């Protein structure tokens, strides 16, 4: 994910800072989308003023197309109106139109739309998963998952991803289709989103086995999408969660890209809306401060650990990381039935979202404050976590005496789970 490219003349960038919006430069290596932009409005803008601005954009864009013979562009495509926080829009504009928009005093900043992608990197067949056992134990190497029988009941997890196979037997009818902002196929044609959903709420693979799962599709069959489409999914999930009870909701984003202020602002708006959000730190073995939305400080950023409690060699790190979670060779659901093994911070993140849903089911709070609770419950075991990075690994409390009330503890043996 990235900012507006350096191809725009320096004089234009300088003028826009003086007269109105800041036009952000694109960082090296960012895969931007030609002539597509995200425009973010000033904080506190009223709906009336926002509607007035949008009308001006549409009028000006049409006038350019008709009177000036400008190159055909699609104009405004998506409008963002989060319940709290970010207001803005994205669209297809030429350089001159962006110049006009940048002069407006009511625009906060503009960035170029860019590609985002899933954060799974490896696949391995026929390997039993270990992540659940690690979440429920204070020592590595366990084969039993201990958890309270509430198991996230009453919570809802929004999986902002490639979609979810809602008919998969893992979900027992608890998964529903929410919205699609990337294509016309309401299905998971990639497999990533179903795997993530299974780790959150699957009956076999899930941390919160009784939670509800809502599929929000923002990535295509190749696991790729755009900042603008992802932000649409984030907005939809926030509004839907608020209608149903934000304090009972968690959101998972096992995706990311290069730094994007718009993506970070959208993530912050989810948190401001009262929803707990877990985000993947990324798989480039670099500081996650340069990744989005992982670098947004108000959400819960997750790095990936190995079965031996080490940092996974691919995992990003840094001060923005809140916790580690199992992310190497994780078994979960795949579309059409059965399971597959994937690795990545994408696989670590749903362990944290699932733990958030689990704690909601236990009545231990809700909203963005769950990240602090999860950090307090975490155990200090990660070896060589990376420069300026926490060594905390998540734990559900059942094995370390953190939760100070009787638990209806269940245990699951891997031999039963996987028919080994």
Swiss-Prot record:
One of its GO terms (molecular function) is serine-type endopeptidase activity. The keyword Protease applies. Its EC number is 3.4.21.-. Glycans are attached at residues 222, 252, 396. Residues 21-119 form a propeptide. Pfam families: Inhibitor_I9, Peptidase_S8. Keywords: Glycoprotein, Hydrolase, Protease, Secreted, Serine protease, Signal, Virulence, Zymogen. Residues 129-413 form the Peptidase S8 domain. Its main location: secreted. GO terms for cellular component: extracellular region. The keyword Secreted applies. SUPFAM superfamilies: Protease propeptides/inhibitors (SSF54897), Subtilisin-like (SSF52743). Gene3D superfamilies: Peptidase S8 propeptide/proteinase inhibitor I9 (3.30.70.80), Peptidase S8/S53 domain (3.40.50.200). It is found in: Secreted. Residues 1-20 form the signal peptide. GO terms for biological process: proteolysis. The active site is at residues 161, 192, 346. Residues 36-118 form the Inhibitor I9 domain. PANTHER family: CEREVISIN-RELATED (PTHR43806:SF11), PEPTIDASE S8 (PTHR43806). Belongs to the peptidase S8 family. Secreted subtilisin-like serine protease with keratinolytic activity that contributes to pathogenicity. This is Subtilisin-like protease 7. It comes from Trichophyton verrucosum (strain HKI 0517). The lineage of its organism: Eukaryota, Fungi, Dikarya, Ascomycota, Pezizomycotina.
């Amino acid at each position: 994910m990235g900012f507006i490219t350096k191809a725009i003349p320096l004089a234009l960038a300088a003028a826009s800072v003086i007269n109105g919006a800041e036009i952000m430069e694109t960082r090296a290596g960012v895969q931007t989308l030609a002539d597509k932009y995200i425009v973010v409005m000033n904080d506190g803008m009223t709906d009336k003023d926002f509607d007035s601005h949008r009308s001006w954009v549409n009028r000006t864009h049409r006038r350019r197309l008709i009177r000036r013979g400008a190159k055909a562009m699609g104009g405004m495509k998506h409008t963002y109106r989060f319940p709290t926080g970010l207001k803005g829009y994205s669209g297809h504009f030429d350089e001159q139109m962006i110049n006009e928009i940048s002069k407006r005093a009511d625009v906060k900043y503009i960035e170029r739309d860019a590609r985002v992608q899933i954060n799974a990197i490896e696949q391995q067949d026929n390997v039993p998963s270990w992540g659940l056992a690690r979440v429920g134990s204070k020592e590595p190497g366990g084969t039993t998952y201990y958890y309270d029988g509430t198991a996230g009941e009453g919570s809802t997890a929004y999986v902002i991803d490639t979609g979810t196979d809602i008919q998969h037997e893992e979900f027992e009818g608890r998964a529903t289709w929410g919205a699609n902002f990337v294509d016309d196929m309401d299905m998971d044609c990639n497999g990533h989103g179903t795997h993530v959903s299974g780790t959150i709420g699957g009956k076999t693979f899930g941390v919160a086995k009784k939670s509800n799962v809502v599929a929000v599709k923002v990535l295509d069959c190749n696991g790729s999408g755009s900042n603008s489409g992802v932000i649409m999914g984030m907005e939809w999930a926030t509004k839907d969660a608020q209608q149903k009870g934000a304090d009972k909701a968690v959101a998972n984003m096992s995706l990311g890209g290069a730094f994007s202020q718009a993506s970070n602002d959208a993530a912050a708006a989810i948190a401001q809306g009262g929803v707990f959000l877990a985000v993947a730190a990324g798989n480039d073995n670099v500081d996650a401060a340069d990744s989005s939305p992982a670098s947004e400080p108000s959400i819960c950023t997750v790095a990936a650990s190995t079965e031996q409690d080490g940092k996974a060699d691919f995992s990003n790190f840094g001060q923005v990381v809140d916790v580690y979670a199992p992310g190497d060779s994780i078994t979960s659901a795949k579309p059409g039935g059965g399971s597959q093994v994937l690795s990545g911070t994408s696989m670590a993140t749903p362990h944290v979202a699932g733990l958030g849903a689990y704690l909601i089911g236990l009545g231990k709070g809700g909203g963005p404050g769950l990240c602090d609770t999860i950090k307090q419950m975490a155990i200090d075991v990660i070896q060589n976590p990376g420069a300026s990075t926490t060594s905390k690994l998540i734990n559900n409390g059942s094995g370390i005496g953190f939760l100070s009330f009787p638990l209806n503890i269940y245990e699951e043996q891997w031999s039963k789970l996987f028919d080994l």
